[in-house]
């Protein structure tokens, strides 16, 4: 988080985790959440993320991602509801199911900027009612 927030002014920096950080930083608010699996995390992002931020946008930075060059930030990014890392063109779910994502290659939310409007809209989705081969946020 310290790498991703270097030279960037955020409205707030929050660490949502089931584990308390070993080192505390005055500008990072630790928010305790239950330990969860892949589906639990997807449910959190789809149904509950809006509970954790009050700003116009939220930058999600998972433990395997970080901001590389903060000087590339543009205020125009805030005009979009979602900016995220690309998926592979094909994702093998199981031996009999391959998702072809050539027409919609964006959706990898591990490093993504999401608007409050988008997050409040997805919160209306009943995660358990989703009928997809892969329930990824």
Language-model regions, residue ranges each:
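Short beta-strand-to-loop acidic/aromatic patch adjacent to the donor-nucleotide binding site
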Residues: 55-68
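Short, hydrophobic beta-strand segments that form beta-sheet elements in well-ordered domains
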Residues: 9-18, 83
